Structures are given as C-alpha cells and as structure tokens.
Amino acid sequence: MCKSLVIVESPVKAKTISKYLGKQYIVKSSVGHVRDLINNKSKNKKNIKKSNIKHNEKTALIQQMGINPYKNWKAEYHILPGKEKIISELKNIANKVHYIYLATDLDREGEAIAWHLKEVIGGNSLKFRRVVFNEITKKSIEKAFQNIGKINMNRVYSQQARRFMDRIVGYMISPLLWKKISRGLSAGRVQSAAVRLITDREYEIKNFIEREHWKISLSLLSKENKKVTMDITHYRNKTFLLNNKKEVNSTIEKIKNLSFIITDRKDKIFKKKPPAPLITSTLQQASNIDLGFSVKKTMFLAQKLYEQGYITYIRTDSYFLSNYAIEKVRSYIENFYGSDFLPKKSNIYSNQKYSQEAHEAIRPSDVQVVNIDNCDPDAKKLYKLIWNYFIASQMKSERYKSIKTTVMADVFKLQSNTKIVLFSGWTKILKKSNNVNFKFPVLDIGTTLILDKILPHQIFTKPPPRFSESSLVRELEKKGIGRPSTYATIITKIKEKGYLKIKKNKFYAAKIGEILITRLKKNFSDLVDYDFTARMEKNLDQVSDKLINWKHLLNSFFDNFSQQLEQAKKPPEEGGMELNTTVPTEIDCSLCNKKMGIKTAVTGVFLSCLGYNSEPNEKRCKNTINLISLNDLSTTKKEEKNFHLKNRCKKCNLVMDVYLINENLKIFICINNPSCNGYNLKKGIFKKSLNCSLKKIKCEKCKNDMLFKTGRFGNFFMCINDTCKNTRKILPNGEISEPKFEPIPFPDILCEKSNTWFVLREGISGIFFAANTFPKSRETRSPFVEELARFEYLLPKKLHYLASAPQRDNKGNKTIVCFNKLNKQQYIASKKEGKFTGWAAFFIDRKWCIVNK
C-alpha cells in the first residue's frame, strides 16, 4: 500500500495528468458522473416486493423523482447503467492504496462528482483528499498536490439544490402538460425562460408593422474636383426625416439650386480598448460568430483542449488573469510584436454582475504554443481563437482619428463621419475593427462645394432580429438566466423538445412552444419570469457561499410551486390551465366525411379528423393532413412579410400563420390558436419553393408511398405503412437523404464501459459503433478497419469498400473509419495514443489514395 489513487472525470484528462505525476500515483477516470437520482426505470424490479396496496399519487411521485420533499429532501441514488465495471475497479484499487485524491473539475458539478465518488467507494473517509487545478500543466498539478483540501459540501449542496429543483419541475409538471396540451412536453426551471425569449421575439416579429422613410445623400465636388458624399441630417435644426416619395421630390426641388459651404470640421483622436480575454459565455458567442460552431460543439472541443492541457479551465465567468500568465503574455508581446504594442501596465477587466467563480479567464496554458498539432482541425481553430483573444487582451488600444465635417445649404445641414486608423494596436491580432481608412479631402472651412448628384434612399424599419445561438447566449447572460456552463445544455434541450426550429442558423418558435409558454405565463409565472429565474441563480450561488441554507431554499420553492400546480390542475373555468383544443374547420375528412380540425402537437400543426375523439376507440377515424408551414418553405423575407401584413384574423385582428394543405389550398390560422378559433382558406395554384415538399417518393423497404412531414428535428418523409414507419430526412439543401441500413449486430465486438456488445449504425456523420442497449448505455466509437474486414460478410454492399481499406498506416498504427463533413465522405485515418497522426486515405476512382500531412 505505497501508491495513491487519483480519480478524474475523463480518460484524456487522466492520461494527461499521469505524465506529470510519478509512478507512486495510479490515475483513473470515472468517465463523468457515476451516480444519479433513482427513477422508476432504474429500479431493480426483482428487489421490489409485491404488494396489493395501490400507491397513492404522492408516493408514486416520490418513487419516480428519487427525492422526498416531504421528508427533509431525502434522496435515493443509484449507480448509472454501464458504470458498474468502473466502480468495481475503483473500489478494488482504493482498498490497496493509502490515499485517494479526487481531482475532478473545480466547479460545482466537479465537486458533486467528487462527493458521489467518495460515497460510492466508501471506506475510511480520512483516506480521501480533494485537489483542484485551473490548468493541466506540470506546475499547476504539482501546486495542487501541495495544497490538498476537503470536499466543499456547500458547493455540493448548491448542485443538489439545482438538481432537485429541476427534478421537481420536470417530474411534477410534465403529466399536467401531457394531459392539458400534448404528449411529450416538459417544462424546466431555466429552459422555459429561454423558450420564452424565443416565443416573445417571434410574437414581436409577426406583429411588427414596418414604416417607410427616406434619407438623402449628396455627392459634392470642390473646385479642385475632389468628391465627397454627405448625408442630410437636419432641416431647420430638426432631425431630417422623410416619410414618402412625395416629400423626397419636394426636398430635391428645394436643394438642387442651393450653395453648399463647409461650416465646421472637427478632428478628434479616440482609443478603442481591446476586448477582455474569453470566459465561457464570450467563448460560446465568439466561436459561433467567427467559426460557425454551435454552443454544444464549442464546449465539447474546449473540454478536450482543457483535458489535453492546452488551455485553462473552461467553465468560468471571471476575467481574472494570474500574475504568472500576465508576465508571460507581456513578454511574448514585446518579443514578437515590439514594445509599441505593449501597454505600460497590464490591462485589467472588471467582472460581470452575476460573476460567481474566482477562476481565471480562459487562456492558453502556454502562450508560446501558437498552434497545436495532432488535434481535430476544429479544435485547432478554437484554440487559435482563444489564443488570439488572450494576446489581444494585453495589447495597447487601437488609436484612430474621427473626422466630423459639417456643410450648410440654407436651412439644410449635411454631415459626414470618417475614421482613420492611426495605430492598429490589438486589432493586429483580432481584426474586428470596422474602421476604413477613407481620407476625407482636406478642405478649409468656408470652402464652397458644387452639387454633383442627389442620391435618395428608401428605408423600411425592421423588426427585431431572430436569435442565433450567439445572440441567445448573450441575452441569457444579460438577464442572468442560467449560468454560462449550462447554456449548451439549455439550448440543446429546447432544440430536442421541438419548441423551436432552426433555419439558416436562426431560431423560429414552433407553434407548440408558443402554446406552452402562453399556458405557463398564466399558471406558472415564476417559471418563465426572467427576474425570478435570475434571483434563483443568485440564491443558488449564495448556497455555495454558505449564505443560504439549501433545504430552506428548496422548501420555499417547492411550497410555491405546489400551490401553482394544484391551481393549474383545475378546469379552465376555475382558473386552471387552458386545454389545447382542436379548432373545427369546414374541411371534410376524406375517409369518414366528418369535419377536420386544427390540432397542434410536438410534431407540428396539422389537420385531424374530429371523429377521432367523438367515436368509441374501435371506430375512431385517424385521418390526418400534414400542414406545411410558410417558414418551412424557401420563401423570401418579402413574401413572409406580405403574408403577415395582408392576413389578419377577423375575430381578434392578430396576424395569421400561413400553411400549405396541398397545391390548390392554403389555410391561414390565427397566431392565438387554439385560444382564438379564427382561420381562413384560400384556393388557387401555389408554387412551392421547397421542391420536395409535395413530391411523392416510394419507401425503399415496403414500396409504399412516403409523405412529407414536419417534426421537431426538421422536415422528413415518412412511410404511410403503419407497420413500416420508415423515414428519410430532408437535408438543408432540400435534397432527400440516402436510405440508411438497419443496425447490424456485432456480438463479437464487446463494449469497454458496459457488459454488452456493439451494433453498427449509420448516422448523419457516417457509420459508427453503438452499444446494443442504447439508450441504457450510450457508449459509441469509430470502427477499426480490421474489424470491418473481419466481418465483411455482415456489411451491406455499399460499405464493402471500407473493408478493403488499409488496416494500418506506414508506421503500424491501426486505422479507423472517419467522416468528412464538408465532402460528406467516409475516409480512413490512423491514431496513436488517442491523437490523429496526420495519415489518411480517401477512396477515389475505386481505389484508396493515401495522404500524409
């Protein structure tokens, strides 16, 4: 018993840390969380005693949630599926060592993982040590092991309080939403406020009424034939504003014979400070804007960079930089850019209103490493972005000259503003300056200019823009909703739930999301109240700081939520939650001649036969008609705007959503549906911008027709055969995806993290191995070529070429199957010690071509 056990969350992190620790340390990974709250699915039914006593509703709910709010928040945990082997191994090693170092991440989640590991491993509590570090470097690791501590239980309590609240809301409100609105719905303490941001913006956009106005620019010439362009800004000392073409023509008549004299010119020198080093939220925004990465992808790549020791810890909202980091970056700037770019003192940035962590900002672990090798190309781009912001944050400000020139023509004032960059400063690294070195002619005050051209411009006011991932993150941060470390999870959840649709990287609220938020505003106002959500985050932070008792906070939240829940369960006429009713229409059902009604579900808006609910189960008519939303068609902004302008509900005067029923019929539905039953039908011949929307294709499995559908993950075709239900996705370019093969069992290839075996699946990023017990075990990996070659007889014909690929590179490293997203092509690459070697092979002209980087 001379060695010590060190436990971290990820295998990559374990591998990196083991390089800096001596042989007396055994470094192992827990592969993330090992325990979670128990639920019905995770209970071992063999251990549940049979009873004739029917559980009452409260008891059943407690069993489902795994927590008991009526008994001082007693919680029941279970080992996560697939983690049994890992826990068994950790326990075995723990019994043979003197000390156990819990080196999980330094945030609340990491603290909770450390506590769960301690509880699961058990044994003498004096053996456990807590070590934390902000970066995975030799110096940082050595310092951490010289300053060992204990698990911070206040941080654990804060994480548990957040987890318990989320579990309460999710488990207690979902049955109500399923009953009152639609199956598959859920609400969340933070996610519902995020959905409200998108639905409120959707409402603003749809009800926006544009206003026309005009501005006039003038092209002027000096006697030396020097040309300048200026805007009319004032008329009789009032802001110049024209509302229509008539006013424009009148103004042109007034100014075309006037004299234009320069009356003022002001030159000022300004400085533009560099942006702060990146924190979690600004990393997500910058990555989305500059690199086009989703928030989820950004956090995934950043986590890998941290675990490999390239950057500091990624979950932080502090702009603080250590003295060591500042000293190194200032030295780098002076050596590589010169002393002109180095400020006399380091740049200091103040933290934000809701800042809670005392960590450093995100920065490179070693500023001398400008580019990294043996990494995913996207990870390299993200590292370079982080490096650029870090360097720029400690450089001198950009200096530029602002030139403001004023010209008078009788009662008209004209102005122009020009910026000339004098010193690039930090923009040498981050080229974010929009300043243009346009030199305004040096003309003296009193100079007379000659009118050359009159340039009128028609302008329309614009509605607020739709949220992108970056702007949604910025708004969440601004309102204090959630924490930056949770933004990726929030956005992923609301995407998966079908509360929004994404078109050209912009968020469109789905109808079911609008209905959900309308109902929550009335019956669960706290869940969608921005200020309440922000205050709760602040309270959870105070739990970490031991300023608030976590159970008192939970009791207060639970009491209030329970009262709202009981009220919402009542009938609508007694103040309960409104139902998601079907709105009758005059459209006849093609199967039973009853009328069709407008129905909204998670899958979208559609027409459903009213005979479905009016008849006994065996006689129900299940006929439905899919409605194709205007937003799902490739219409122009002008077309979309015109639809909303021209069609308003005759019952409530709100705008109407437009759907295509078929090539000869459109339906306009009030945006307040189903609360308002207003709708209009329009007959005609309608051209489709989305060419495949009404296209008929045959199912490759059963040869029946496939119909266009709209779902929470986008548009697709679905087989009309109920026993088949085959689907084909519609790609962003409008094309229909190629048919995918059925999962192929590989019982001889076993999983590493669970007692099961792999199946070969085909996804949007090519083929991959996945555990056959998915979703119980979510283990996945890329297939080795030698595995495909060994079991070639199991593969469909279209994959046989992969089995013929080189099984090893020129240095003997095994090759795996990869996917090029740009070219939508499978290729072969090799790895050594978990990193790509740069060797690759592509299948071109029916043969494998090897590429060495």
Curated annotation (Swiss-Prot):
* EC class name: isomerase
Which sites bind Mg(2+)? Answer: 9, 105
Q: Does the keyword Zinc apply?
A: yes
How does this chain assemble? Monomer.
> What HAMAP family does the entry give?
Topoisom_1_prok
* Active-site feature positions: 313 (o-(5'-phospho-dna)-tyrosine intermediate)
The EC number(s) given in the record are 5.6.2.1
Known PANTHER family for this protein? DNA TOPOISOMERASE, DNA TOPOISOMERASE, TYPE IA, CORE
- Region Interaction with DNA, residue ranges: 186-191
Which catalysed reactions does the entry list for this protein?
ATP-independent breakage of single-stranded DNA, followed by passage and rejoining
Q: Which organism is it from?
A: Buchnera aphidicola subsp. Schizaphis graminum (strain Sg)
- The site feature described as Interaction with DNA is recorded at 33, 162-163, 166, 171, 178, 315
User: Start and end of every Toprim domain?
Assistant: 3-136
Q: What is the lineage of its organism?
A: Bacteria, Pseudomonadati, Pseudomonadota, Gammaproteobacteria, Enterobacterales
Q: Which UniProt keywords apply?
A: DNA-binding, Isomerase, Magnesium, Metal-binding, Repeat, Topoisomerase, Zinc, Zinc-finger
Q: Which InterPro entries match?
A: TOP1_Znf, Topo_IA, Topo_IA_2, Topo_IA_AS, Topo_IA_cen, Topo_IA_cen_sub1, Topo_IA_cen_sub2, Topo_IA_cen_sub3
Q: Where in the numbering of this chain does the Topo IA-type catalytic domain appear? A: 152-565
Q: Name one GO molecular function term.
A: zinc ion binding
GO annotations under biological process?
DNA topological change
Question: Which PROSITE patterns does the UniProt record give?
Answer: TOPO_IA_1, TOPO_IA_2, TOPRIM
Concerning its family, UniProt says: Belongs to the type IA topoisomerase family.
Write the protein's name. DNA topoisomerase 1
- The reply on keyword Thylakoid is no
The UniProt entry's GO CC annotations, sorted and at most eight, read: chromosome
Q: What does this protein do?
A: Releases the supercoiling and torsional tension of DNA, which is introduced during the DNA replication and transcription, by transiently cleaving and rejoining one strand of the DNA duplex. Introduces a single-strand break via transesterification at a target site in duplex DNA. The scissile phosphodiester is attacked by the catalytic tyrosine of the enzyme, resulting in the formation of a DNA-(5'-phosphotyrosyl)-enzyme intermediate and the expulsion of a 3'-OH DNA strand. The free DNA strand then undergoes passage around the unbroken strand, thus removing DNA supercoils.
Q: Where are the zinc fingers (C4-type)?
A: 589-621, 649-676, 699-724
**Which Pfam family would be a valid example here?**
Toprim
